[in-house]
From Swiss-Prot:
Residues 52-69 have a biased composition (Polar residues). The gene is RARA. This is Retinoic acid receptor alpha. Residues 425-435 have a biased composition (Gly residues). Ubiquitous. Residues 183-417 form the NR LBD domain. Residues 46-78, 418-460 are annotated as: Disordered. Residues 88-153 bind DNA. Belongs to the nuclear hormone receptor family. NR1 subfamily. Receptor for retinoic acid. Retinoic acid receptors bind as heterodimers to their target response elements in response to their ligands, all-trans or 9-cis retinoic acid, and regulate gene expression in various biological processes. The RAR/RXR heterodimers bind to the retinoic acid response elements (RARE) composed of tandem 5'-AGGTCA-3' sites known as DR1-DR5. Required for hindbrain patterning and appears to be required for skin development. Residues 442-460 have a biased composition (Low complexity). Composed of three domains: a modulating N-terminal domain, a DNA-binding domain and a C-terminal ligand-binding domain.
């Protein structure tokens, strides 16, 4: 026993079974076989054996381990629960997180961002109290935007986010090289030619003006309306001629050709007239040379659509589009597989693909240092559709303002492809598909197979 006591660890130092022990070994209990550290320094001598070191019993270890947090391993942490957000504050759809200050879905987040970044101006055609939910949210953009503001979405968050992205994303030069193959070059030239033959450039026109209601807005100037409706009818005919020259368009079924023309004719009309915008005089010029200022355009029939159209024309100016780009963008608007009631949407999509590729290659080759110009052009199609939808609504109110009947070809062009005549038809009624003019009319039909080119007609 005496020999064992000589190897007993002491607080001041010594040896433990032949190994030296530092004076502060009690601070590391694992070195002492699992012993707990002392609760206080003065009582250390009472807690350590004086007759020799012995291995503590399991009961002792259990007691000691429960009295010390340092040697009891903590149980593994459970995996974090998935983060659950409140439903979208705007439409009550499933939220993807907090966007611009509130819980919102991806749809409402994107709608709010686009509305603020583009300074969109919407109109409610009811009482400005439309119900907004995940089913109805796309029916009224005005009320949807108002609800975004009501639930707390912040304009400044959109602007700050945009500025941050501009700072964070370094400017990169377009490193891709775009080679125009003979096939692509041939397609571009065909579309350019089709556009130029059906829509003369502004520099080719002999501009003239009129003094009709040029200074004050009125609900409708009948003389200007008569001239505008005449030019619009000619524009529809020229749009059909343009479509017939596009590669592959006439291989579609007659029904699909008519569906595409009726869906996109107003898009193309607006795009074309906006390329003839002169910002210095704030005027637009039609194909016969008639040049109208903003007030006259309003009084000719554009009405509440006027400022939207002029704003779109201003947005086109920085793009500096030439005839090939305008023609290709018009063709992409026309040949689009997402139009309703198409018989062969997949075939339409396949016809659109080379047009998209041709526009991308042409735009990026023409502007090698502006890689974002191509997507900017494509985004204009969305703007055109928005304006065209309001244009179709404008025709309904215009029908009540004009003294006579709506020109047959304009009425046929705006017949809704879902079976509702926007000018007074009944939903679900029989569809003529625009195969011929109304009985007794001498106006040409919208049908591509029946429209004839006329050297005397010019589009707006």
């Amino acid at each position: 026993m005496a020999s064992n006591s000589s190897s007993c660890p002491t607080p001041g130092g010594g040896h433990l079974n032949g190994y030296p022990v530092t004076p502060y070994a009690f601070f590391f209990p694992h070195m002492l076989g699992g012993l707990s550290p002392p609760s206080s320094l003065p009582g250390i001598q009472h807690q350590l054996p004086v007759s020799g070191y012995s291995t503590p019993s399991p009961a002792t270890v259990e007691t000691q381990s429960t009295s010390s947090e340092e040697i009891v391993p903590s149980p593994p942490s459970p995996p974090p629960l998935p983060r659950i957000y409140k439903p979208c504050f705007v439409c009550q759809d499933k939220s993807s997180g907090y966007h611009y200050g509130v819980s919102a879905c991806e749809g409402c987040k994107g709608f709010f961002r686009r509305s603020i970044q583009k300074n969109m101006v919407y109109t409610c055609h009811r009482d400005k109290n439309c119900i907004i939910n995940k089913v109805t949210r796309n029916r009224c953009q005005y009320c949807r935007l108002q609800k975004c503001f009501e639930v707390g979405m912040s304009k400044e968050s959109v602007r700050n986010d945009r500025n941050k992205k501009k700072k964070d994303v370094p400017k990169t030069e377009c490193s891709e090289s775009y080679i125009v193959t003979p096939e692509v070059e041939e397609l571009i030239e065909k579309v350019r030619k089709a556009h130029q033959e059906t829509f003369p450039a502004l520099c080719q026109l002999g501009k003239y003006t009129t003094n009709n209601s040029s200074e004050q807005r009125v609900s409708l100037d009948i003389d200007l309306w008569d001239k505008f409706s005449e030019l619009s009818t000619k524009c529809i005919i020229k749009t059909v001629e343009f479509a017939k020259q596009l590669p592959g368009f006439t291989t579609l079924t007659i029904a699909d050709q008519i569906t595409l023309l009726k869906a996109a004719c107003l898009d193309i009309l607006i795009l074309r007239i906006c390329t003839r915008y002169t910002p210095e005089q704030d005027t637009m010029t039609f194909s016969d040379g008639l040049t109208l200022n903003r007030t006259q355009m309003h009084n000719a029939g554009f009405g509440p659509l006027t400022d939207l159209v002029f704003a779109f024309a201003n947005q086109l100016l920085p793009l500096e589009m030439d005839d090939a780009e305008t023609g290709l963008l018009s063709a992409i608007c026309l040949i689009c597989g997402d139009r309703q009631d198409l018989e062969q949407p997949d075939k339409v999509d396949k016809l659109q693909e080379p047009l998209l590729e041709a526009l991308k290659i042409y735009v990026r080759k023409r502007r090698p240092n502006k890689p974002h110009m191509f997507p900017k052009m494509l985004m204009k199609i969305t703007d055109l559709r928005s304006i065209s939808a309001k244009g179709a609504e404008r025709v309904i109110t215009l029908k009540m303002e004009i003294p006579g009947s709506m020109p047959p070809l304009i009425q046929e062009m705006l017949e809704n492809s879902e079976g509702m005549d926007t000018l007074g038809g009944q939903p679900g009624g029989p569809r003529t598909g625009g195969l011929g003019p109304p009985p007794g009319s001498c106006s040409p039909s919208l049908s591509p197979s029946s429209t004839r080119s006329s050297p005397a007609t010019h589009s707006p």
